[in-house]
Amino acid sequence: MAMTVHCDIVSAEGEIFSGLVEMVIAHGNLGDLGIAPGHAPLITDLKPGPIRLIKQGGEAEVFYISGGFLEVQPNMVKVLADTVQRAADLDEASAQAAVLAAEKALNEKGADFDYGSATARLAEAAAQLRTVQQIRKKFGG
C-alpha cells in the first residue's frame, strides 16, 4: 500500500475535499509543485488553475481553484482557496465565453475601466479554459 498524506481543500463556501492522497499537484506562484507524504513544510500562494489529487489506488481527482494558498506539513496538506470547483463541473463553452468577454473588456476601455481587475478576470477565465482543455485532452472527454 502506498504512503499517503491527509489533504483538505477549503474555500469560503466550506470544505470541498478531505481525505488521504498519495500526491497533490498544484500551480504555485514560482512553478508547479508535487507534494508527496513527508514533504518538507512550506507555505506558498497558488495561481488560478487545476489542483490534481492522486488518491489511494492511483485514482486522480481534479479541482479548479481561482487562487489561494497551500500549506504543507509532514502529515497534512491544506489548500485554502478563494473559490473551488470540481473540474468535471466546469463548462468549456462558459469558460470560452468568459475569456472572450474579458478580452473585449480589455479592448473597449470605458470611463470607469480598471486594468488590474480586467486582467485578473482574463487570467482566471483563461485558467479555467486551460483546465477544461487539459482534462478533455487527457481523458478524451
Swiss-Prot record:
<dbReference type="InterPro" id="IPR020547">
    <property type="entry name" value="ATP_synth_F1_esu_C"/>
</dbReference>
<dbReference type="GO" id="GO:0005886">
    <property type="term" value="C:plasma membrane"/>
</dbReference>
<keyword id="KW-0375">Hydrogen ion transport</keyword>
<dbReference type="GO" id="GO:0005524">
    <property type="term" value="F:ATP binding"/>
</dbReference>
<keyword id="KW-0139">CF(1)</keyword>
<keyword id="KW-0813">Transport</keyword>
<dbReference type="InterPro" id="IPR001469">
    <property type="entry name" value="ATP_synth_F1_dsu/esu"/>
</dbReference>
<dbReference type="GO" id="GO:0045259">
    <property type="term" value="C:proton-transporting ATP synthase complex"/>
</dbReference>
<keyword id="KW-0997">Cell inner membrane</keyword>
<dbReference type="Pfam" id="PF02823">
    <property type="entry name" value="ATP-synt_DE_N"/>
</dbReference>
<keyword id="KW-0406">Ion transport</keyword>
<keyword id="KW-1003">Cell membrane</keyword>
<comment type="function">
    <text>Produces ATP from ADP in the presence of a proton gradient across the membrane.</text>
</comment>
<comment type="similarity">
    <text>Belongs to the ATPase epsilon chain family.</text>
</comment>
<keyword id="KW-0472">Membrane</keyword>
<dbReference type="GO" id="GO:0046933">
    <property type="term" value="F:proton-transporting ATP synthase activity, rotational mechanism"/>
</dbReference>
<comment type="subunit">
    <text>F-type ATPases have 2 components, CF(1) - the catalytic core - and CF(0) - the membrane proton channel. CF(1) has five subunits: alpha(3), beta(3), gamma(1), delta(1), epsilon(1). CF(0) has three main subunits: a, b and c.</text>
</comment>
<dbReference type="InterPro" id="IPR036771">
    <property type="entry name" value="ATPsynth_dsu/esu_N"/>
</dbReference>
<keyword id="KW-0066">ATP synthesis</keyword>
<dbReference type="InterPro" id="IPR020546">
    <property type="entry name" value="ATP_synth_F1_dsu/esu_N"/>
</dbReference>
<dbReference type="Pfam" id="PF00401">
    <property type="entry name" value="ATP-synt_DE"/>
</dbReference>
<protein>
    <recommendedName>
        <fullName>ATP synthase epsilon chain</fullName>
    </recommendedName>
</protein>
<dbReference type="InterPro" id="IPR036794">
    <property type="entry name" value="ATP_F1_dsu/esu_C_sf"/>
</dbReference>
